[in-house]
Amino acid sequence: MTGLFREPAAYSIAVLIFSLLSLSTIGPVYSEPSAPLAKPSHLDAQVSRFLNDARHSWRGWNVPYKDGKILYDLVIKGKFKHILEIGTSTGHSTIWLAWAASKTGGKVTTIEIDRDRYTTALENFRKSGVAPYIDAHLADAHDLVRSLKGPFDFVFCDADKNWYLQYFIDLAPKISDGGCYTAHNALQGGRDVEVFLDYIKGDARFRTTIERGSGEGMSISCKIAE
């Protein structure tokens, strides 16, 4: 495990955001809060093995491996506990987030609208060992996001691009000071993502940068403490 999470130079901007910031519901459809939690060393081995074995087999709008590692590192560095994911797909990014949450004492709330992808994700959560750290919803995020009370200190959005801006508008008041709102496909998402990025970069409550990662890009917007 010692070599898995080296910090490449590409992470420097994200680290800078955290340095700058230091200066300044609806019940889940699926949850296993009572499941026995694996010891950290055992869980690390189980998740790492699962992610490595499945590294080249993810389909259906899952993030690339490199971007999953970025999510993991952001949650660990920020010590985030109240995590929301919009767009589970079959669970690759969720597993990275939940693995990090297992170390920060947190939990991931994730939303998926497609039943087949949702069902596959649940099985992947069990196989990887992170199911106890996930509340998974089979729901339309357009409606559910508005209903969730928060607060959240980390949000990852990887869903319908034409709704990126609305998701942020709905969630911005529910993000804790010092928390981060991240969105995938920041470099390849088309006009809808450009509109979202223009809006969030102009929001004085947040400081935003783009992490290239796999090349698809991830926007990282951290809320400035008042």
Residue ranges and their predicted role:
Residues 4-5, 13-156, 161-226:
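A short alpha-helical cap/connector motif
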